[in-house]
Amino acid sequence: MNPVIKTFQFGQSTVTLETGRIARQATGAVLVTVDNDVTVLVTVVGAKQADPGKGFFPLSVHYQEKTYAAGKIPGGFFKREGRPSEKETLTSRLIDRPIRPLFPEGFMNEVQVVCTVVSTSKKTDPDIAAMIGTSAALAISGIPFEGPIGAARVAFHESTGYLLNPTYEQLAASSLDMVVAGTSDAVLMVESEAQELTEDQMLGAVLFAHDEFQAVIKAVKELAAEAAKPTWDWKPADKNSALFDAIRAEFGEAVSQGYTITVKADRYARLGELRDQAVAKFSGEEGQPSAGEVKDIFGEIEYRTVRENIVNGKPRIDGRDTKTVRPLNIEVGVLPKTHGSALFTRGETQALVVATLGTARDAQLLDTLEGEKKDPFMLHYNFPPFSVGECGRMGGAGRREIGHGRLARRSVQAMLPAADVFPYTIRVVSEITESNGSSSMASVCGASLALMDAGVPMKAPVAGIAMGLVKEGEKFAVLTDILGDEDHLGDMDFKVAGTAKGVTALQMDIKINGITEEIMEIALGQALEARLNILGQMNQIIGESRTELSANAPTMIAMKIDTDKIRDVIGKGGATIRAICEETKASIDIEDDGSIKIFGETKEAADAAKQRILGITAEAEIGKIYVGKVERIVDFGAFVNILPGKDGLVHISMLSDARVEKVTDVLKEGQEVEVLVLDVDNRGRIKLSIKDVAAAKASGV
């Protein structure tokens, strides 16, 4: 196959799509280049036959950043890329979310997407190029796929408005970082963080991105017209409508009644009984459908029952209307020895959230393509199997946990104080102890509460809410505070977090076409109403950050010294600062501008380290009285140490008003004496007096 190349303009960037030159044995492969800044190779491979043992669609997306792309060699002993970084995992999820709903229902063939960043100038994030490449590779592969999709990143400046596909530099000055993906007529995915933008500004960004990425969809279609392989001859299995009707006639009413049981465990137990009865009645004998087929149809009946009840105005599964938030129970300071803690319960979803303060050295070190960075804020989300009453694998964080943790982090990050105001490293951990929908938004509320409990000076409290949608034909219902079942059986997962003033994070995943601007407006409006309700209840428990840090938190003291004194504090080979840290049990961070941060496990430790540094950096003040120690006696006087590393001379004539024949008649080495600084010459030599101390004290020095 001869290479096919398509070039198009996408906002301020020129994008080139090339296929037919690299990775030709993959089902589909596209090399995407954006402005010669970023190059990503995207491959798609699809299995021709489905694995009959799998009852799900085995799609996997792998985004990987090669260090050679930025002209770097990996750190570490083995000098090769290891397990995926958090950034790679999050980008893999970002690509997966908009493409997954576009594979046809019933398609069970394994599909693997691999996006490899092979070149970057480190000016822009390669994730949009990877998403465009995924769309193009799927479009030319012949695999059944209802695309193509487009994707775009949007920034926002109050003065200039929306900006398409900003650079890292432009993004740093923006109050919005939003990624949007979708088809020519529908938005499928939104991921964003913002600095208290209004709902209208957020919706405007979504619509702006959708309009702009039509250029991507047009270019992908043109590439596919020239380079696409024949579409696979795949058809979904025929549905057994007779079996569906029979099971529904027998169990439909019981299923509907089962979905009125408000307690999740009881509801699941009852529906499990009904499912087992259906399997026993309609399968097992020769010539009857398999148990798997009966279970699938029973699941279809559950799906339709819940949806029809909701769009026809019946109460939801737990008896609520579409706008009511589940009952809240909020506690702070629940763990006595932690720095800050909160227990946030919303219905059957519960998060135990803990905030910990650390020193600058506790910051997360990130080795990225753009270089090494230090991240002073971490938010980790844990979802143990007991939270849903199950046994399961325990171990490191999975993709879902990483994704939920990042969403919660985005939600509260904009409200954290600046590093120069509050220079602590902050780690928040959300332990999901019960789950029935929207645990990530419970983590947002709990994180805000725990941070305020810890005394972190938050700009404003933050709350989050998950919205859902059920749409049948022209009928639709937007649901506030969705349950796990409503998330699973609905058409949209729409999470909004923010303050009373504006939105700080918006995440949206849509499973169907036809989500209109009107529906998104309604969802944002209901989310605002719910968010204000939750914030009101949170503020009754703790309305603002505590004025003092927890007694268990490290004490931090900030100070500044002259830059030419830095070497004195550090000492030869770091000996001085190391000695201070070891002796006071404090940790000390010194910046090139002379800024010093001292962290002590106790206030006494931090104060002791501060005094040591002041002693090293202090200058002798003329006219000030010091208590010094006689270091050395000579014929013409005595050298007295008044500050660490600083000795002054008391001339024999300055020892006493009476005549002194020998210095040793008045002083001895090691003796402590009060001395007055008379002068410091331009060479730093200090002239001291003992005889003038009394007069200086009398005059009020």
UniProtKB/Swiss-Prot annotation:
Locations listed in the record: Cytoplasm
Alphabetized SUPFAM superfamilies for the sequence: Eukaryotic type KH-domain (KH-domain type I), Nucleic acid-binding proteins, Ribonuclease PH domain 2-like, Ribosomal protein S5 domain 2-like
Catalytic activity: RNA(n+1) + phosphate = RNA(n) + a ribonucleoside 5'-diphosphate
Gene3D superfamilies referenced in this protein's UniProt entry, alphabetically: GHMP Kinase, N-terminal domain, K Homology domain, type 1, Nucleic acid-binding proteins
Main location: cytoplasm
GO-annotated cellular components: cytosol
Cofactor(s) it depends on: Mg(2+)
Binding of Mg(2+), residues: D487, D493
EC number: 2.7.7.8
InterPro entries: ExoRNase_PH_dom1 (IPR001247), ExoRNase_PH_dom2 (IPR015847), ExoRNase_PH_dom2_sf (IPR036345), KH_dom (IPR004087), KH_dom_type_1 (IPR004088), KH_dom_type_1_sf (IPR036612), NA-bd_OB-fold (IPR012340), PNPase (IPR012162)
Enzyme class: transferase
All copies of domain S1 motif, residue ranges: 623-691
CDD domains xrefs: KH-I_PNPase, RNase_PH_PNPase_1, RNase_PH_PNPase_2, S1_PNPase
Cystines in this chain: none
GO terms classed as biological process: mRNA catabolic process; RNA processing
HAMAP family named in the record: PNPase
Role this protein plays: Involved in mRNA degradation. Catalyzes the phosphorolysis of single-stranded polyribonucleotides processively in the 3'- to 5'-direction.
NCBIfam families referenced in this protein's UniProt entry, alphabetically: polynuc_phos, PRK11824.1
Binding partners and assembly: Component of the RNA degradosome, which is a multiprotein complex involved in RNA processing and mRNA degradation.
Family: Belongs to the polyribonucleotide nucleotidyltransferase family.
Record-given protein name: Polyribonucleotide nucleotidyltransferase
